[in-house]
Amino acid sequence: MEYKPNGHETIKSALFVDFDNVFSGLRKLDEDAAKHFATNPGRWLAWLERGLRKETSSPDTFHERSVLIRRCYLNPIAFGKYRRYFTQNAFSISDCPPLTQQGKNSTDIHMALDILDTLGHPTRFDEFIIFSGDSDFTPVLLRLRAYDRRTLIMTGAAAAQSYKAASDLVINGHRFIAEGLTGLKDEESDNVKSFAQSVKRLSVENGLRSLSARLPNFTTT
């Protein structure tokens, strides 16, 4: 952890996103929110780094995150159209196509292996962030705890109590929508209103010019 003046602390974090799980969970709560999660990762990433500050016992100290590793795991067949939004925000993408007729893929295995590999990274990460409601990651969280690493999970929809208990901080889908995605819908609405006002103003100006051109040109002597 890097300490800065005035009680500021920066947590070095590694982020792992189970896209299919989170997108499906958010879609059950709010389809628009799921779309915003998929198409504007930069927004909620900024919230993770600066907006979501870890609670601390000292009122003069707060933590900011520096997400140094960003990895997203998705099914390219079902969700390939969202891939570019994550690459544009410096995510490494792991394609995890379905392996069975039921649509089961290998996301959980790939994520678990990458998380455990990151434990041995030259950069000692203070915190591991897992975006998934899959309780199969419970043993991974317990391993991270044994190595004295802070953990944060974002569950999307409902998650098992044992899974949530294994993490230091739990963000459910409702809080993520309210805080991490807040303002996105309002911004879209404001953009639409602004565009409509511009069109209306342009129409009025064009109408005035047309009327002025048709009026006789009176001159005084």
Residue ranges of each PLM-predicted region?
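Domain-level signal for Mg2+-assisted phosphodiester chemistry and nucleotide/NA-binding surfaces
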Residues: 1-110, 120, 145, 150-152
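Accessory DNA-binding and partner-docking regions appended to nucleic-acid-acting proteins
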Residues: 219-221
